[in-house]
Amino acid sequence: MLPTPSQFHYLFNMRELSKVFQGLILAERDRFRENDRFVQPFGGKVKSPEAYLVALWRHECERVFCDKLTTHEDKDWGDKLIMKLIDETYGEDIRAQVEDRVYFVDFLRPPKVDEETGETVDANPSYYESTESLDSLRVVAMARQATFNETSKSLKLDLVLFEDVLKHMMRISRLLCMERGSALLIGVGGSGKQSLTRLAAYIAGAFPFQIQITKTYNQANLFEDLKSLYKVAGLKGQKVAFIFTDAEVKDESFLEYINQILMTGEVAGLFPK
């Protein structure tokens, strides 16, 4: 799959391969133990820890490689290639177990509560594991949306969590649980991209950060906002979800600074040495 003038982003290198392994090592290791009566159902047709690992690998390959593809034909080609590799490497039994897609998320478990004091120890426990079905995931997502609306004083979410919305939310949530995870969300205005990102950020325990554009907003203002963002993330150790829309690109130089954040995690000259 090579880049073309209309699909110039079809570029794949070792960075993509490393992201697959990043996803693999996020997984909850208890799910790979044999004969563990505490292990919940794997999801789909998966019946063994070996097939569970292969299902996880398939999921990560789809997130890293197939999600970059823009046409149904290309996505089908990518999926068939993945399944062919599984069949050739692991055989028919494993292939049959992972034939149905298994989705992985990190927000299925309820908040951890101290049994003695009743206080919440961890409001967003992160365990990257499979979900039994999209229906069970929808129940969790709806509960989180209801909690968000109860705690938010200004913004209220009213997302209809149909299948495609759930899949997009899973993609965003996966990226938010990774170091410097990022996504480019493309769609018509008003389709819910920002609302979905805010819900995913809330579920991940990340602080949603967005600049406030004015007529006089310039590079100096952007730097001040970025300093505030880095102080929240660096000094306070708070997870941050930086939401940046096309309407906020007041100057072409803004994109260069965003690119620096994505590539290195730093902005040259932001803080004096």
Task: Annotate each predicted stretch with a short phrase.
Residues 220-247:
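Conserved alpha-helical scaffold flanking the Walker A/P-loop in AAA+ ATPase domains
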Residues 179-183, 238-240:
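Pre-Walker A (Motif I) flank of P-loop NTPase domains
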Residues 20, 199, 221, 225, ...:
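Alpha-helical scaffold elements adjacent to nucleotide-binding pockets in ATP/GTP-utilizing enzyme cores
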Residues 172, 185, 244:
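Hydrophobic anchor at the beta1->P-loop junction of P-loop NTPases
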Residues 159-160, 208-220:
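Flexible beta-alpha connector loops of hexameric P-loop NTPases
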Residues 1-179:
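Alpha-helical lid/collar subdomain of P-loop NTPases
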Residues 243-273:
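Conserved AAA+/SF3 P-loop NTPase catalytic/coupling segment centered on the Walker-B
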Residues 181-212, 256-257, 262:
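Walker A/P-loop
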